[in-house]
């Protein structure tokens, strides 16, 4: 399908012609609309079937179109046209791969030097092969727990910037936290520091024009990622930049779950306390984070900054605390990078798998791997929020609980506030922390970035934090959970049916 949209428009035009030339004026409006909707829905269903999507995705779209033709038609135009994903990002994918190979090299020697078990080594090989990122043995990391520690550390490091500041965020708000960030960036820009800021056009759609203009007037290059002007006709509305990246002078980096907003400090009345995790990075691995930003910057602006000024080979090497790997995932990748690495982490486990995720909507591969791990006697724990953020995702998530509980997975509901951490810890030795949720949107559609940690001090801190979080959580009992009302089960089932679209 070279251009499905054009064909859909053609079908609509034919239907309109039949409508206008109809000699039977009685019931003309209803008949015309029926022809319009029927032709469009049938054609879209035909296109979806030819795209050879995963069966669950195909069936879900067919059910939606069959049950709600008009709504399904417009919903598909906005969110369903993934057939163009390869074409949209083919050039970006090719350039990204060439850039990583040029600036990162192969670095197999680092994998061989990693002091890990042989059963864990294939995970590093996989991350290197599909993530195009070497493991660094010369990088310091520090876990930042919750908003107060994260923002105070970020603002402190921004104040020290002397050459450049690069930021990439999904959500930016013009509230107290956003104003504090703006003040620092304007001050730095006026002092000659190069400040570049990528913000997602959909995630930050509420960001005021005044906020943006004030930054631009001060010399900050403020660029929206994939702006959407006509939602129903946009090819990119479904592919959002969910990354949260800061790079300062090419030596300090940040990545994790927190966007820019007051709610991440626990100031939202509904959510209250906000539980989240971020990562401070210094050393060699920051180079990978810089590359990810620079490639996204080039994709949106056409301006290349792949120069020694921003990618100096003479990085200061810090004493590593184990291995650190920064991995980007997204619709521009040939492989479902983040999902494959999550799967590999789960299947490499020998003792335990601990997961914290605000949106737990796994696909069949991840779901099966978790059940098999639990049935094999491993300590599998999932920490999820008790309070819903996005209700349809919340109920879809809970629909997976019975089969996981029955397999022996321990599921806990965090009740102190809202849990937004995106963490996986395996055997207390390997960990992932970043922007990717344990859901299909992060696996298939969003641009994400995660840090994978191997035998680091930060992994120990994540373990300690997870155990502390369990003190604020309640375990779900299988028998009790099975007694929930039928109405709730129906909502969960319908939400799960839509989960491939979430």
UniProtKB/Swiss-Prot annotation:
Topology in the lipid bilayer: Multi-pass membrane protein
SUPFAM superfamilies recorded: Phospholipase D/nuclease
Main location: membrane
Pfam families: PLDc_2 (PF13091), PLDc_N (PF13396)
A Gene Ontology cellular-component term: plasma membrane
Record-level Gene Ontology MF annotations: cardiolipin synthase activity
The reaction(s) this protein catalyses: 2 a 1,2-diacyl-sn-glycero-3-phospho-(1'-sn-glycerol) = a cardiolipin + glycerol
Entry keywords, A to Z: Cell membrane, Lipid biosynthesis, Lipid metabolism, Membrane, Phospholipid biosynthesis, Phospholipid metabolism, Repeat, Transferase, Transmembrane, Transmembrane helix
Domain of life: Bacteria
Domain (PLD phosphodiesterase) ranges: 237-264, 415-442
Transmembrane segments: 7-27, 29-49, 59-79
EC number(s) reported in the record: 2.7.8.-
Active site: 242, 244, 249, 420, 422, 427
Compartment list: Cell membrane
Family note: Belongs to the phospholipase D family. Cardiolipin synthase subfamily.
HAMAP family: Cardiolipin_synth_Cls
Protein name: Cardiolipin synthase
Biological source species: Geobacillus sp. (strain WCH70)
Record gene name: cls
């Amino acid at each position: 399908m070279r251009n499905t949209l054009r064909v859909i428009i053609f079908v609509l035009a034919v239907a309109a012609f039949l409508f206008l030339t109809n000699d039977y004026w009685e019931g003309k409006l209803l008949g015309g609309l029926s022809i319009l909707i029927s032709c469009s829905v049938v054609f879209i269903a035909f296109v979806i079937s030819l795209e050879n999507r995963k069966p669950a995705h195909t069936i879900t779209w067919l059910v939606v179109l069959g049950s709600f033709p008009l709504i399904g038609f417009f919903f598909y135009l906005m969110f369903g046209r993934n057939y163009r994903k390869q074409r949209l990002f083919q050039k970006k994918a090719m350039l990204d791969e060439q850039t990583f190979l040029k600036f990162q090299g192969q670095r197999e020697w680092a994998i061989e030097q990693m002091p890990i078990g042989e059963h864990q080594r294939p995970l590093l090989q996989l991350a290197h092969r599909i993530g195009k990122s070497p493991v660094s043995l010369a990088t310091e990391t520090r876990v930042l727990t919750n908003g107060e520690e994260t923002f105070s550390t970020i603002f402190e490091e921004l104040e020290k910037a002397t050459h450049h500041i690069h930021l990439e965020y999904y959500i930016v708000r013009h509230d107290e936290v956003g104003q504090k960030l703006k003040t620092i960036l304007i001050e730095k820009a006026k002092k000659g520091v190069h400040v570049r800021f990528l913000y997602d056009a959909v995630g930050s759609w509420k960001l005021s024009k005044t906020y943006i203009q004030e930054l631009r007037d001060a010399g900050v290059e403020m660029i929206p990622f994939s702006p959407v002007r006509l939602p129903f006709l946009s090819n990119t509305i479904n592919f959002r930049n969910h990354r949260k990246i800061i790079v300062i002078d090419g030596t300090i980096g940040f990545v994790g779950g927190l966007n820019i907003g007051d709610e991440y400090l626990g100031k939202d009345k509904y959510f209250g306390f906000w539980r989240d995790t971020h990562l401070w990075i210094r050393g060699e691995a920051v180079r990978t984070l810089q590359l990810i930003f620079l490639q996204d910057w080039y994709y949106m602006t056409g301006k290349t900054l792949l120069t020694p000024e921003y990618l100096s080979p003479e990085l200061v090497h810090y004493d590593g605390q184990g291995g650190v790997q920064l991995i980007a995932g997204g619709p521009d990748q040939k492989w479902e990078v983040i999902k494959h690495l999550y799967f590999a982490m789960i299947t490499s486990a020998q003792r335990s798998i601990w997961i914290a995720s605000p949106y737990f909507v796994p696909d069949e591969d991840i779901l099966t791997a978790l059940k098999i791990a639990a049935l094999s006697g491993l300590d599998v724990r999932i920490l999820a929020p008790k309070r819903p953020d996005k209700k349809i995702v919340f109920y879809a998530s809970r629909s997976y609980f019975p089969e996981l509980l029955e397999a022996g997975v321990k599921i806990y509901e965090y009740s102190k506030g809202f849990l937004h951490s995106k963490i996986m810890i395996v055997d207390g030795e390997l960990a992932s922390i970043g922007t990717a949720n344990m859901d299909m949107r992060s696996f298939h559609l969003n641009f994400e970035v995660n840090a994978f940690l191997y035998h680091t001090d930060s992994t120990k801190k994540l373990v300690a934090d997870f155990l502390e979080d369990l003190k604020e959580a309640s375990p779900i009992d299988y028998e009790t959970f099975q007694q929930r009302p039928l109405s709730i089960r129906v909502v969960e089932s319908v939400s799960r049916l839509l989960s491939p679209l979430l």
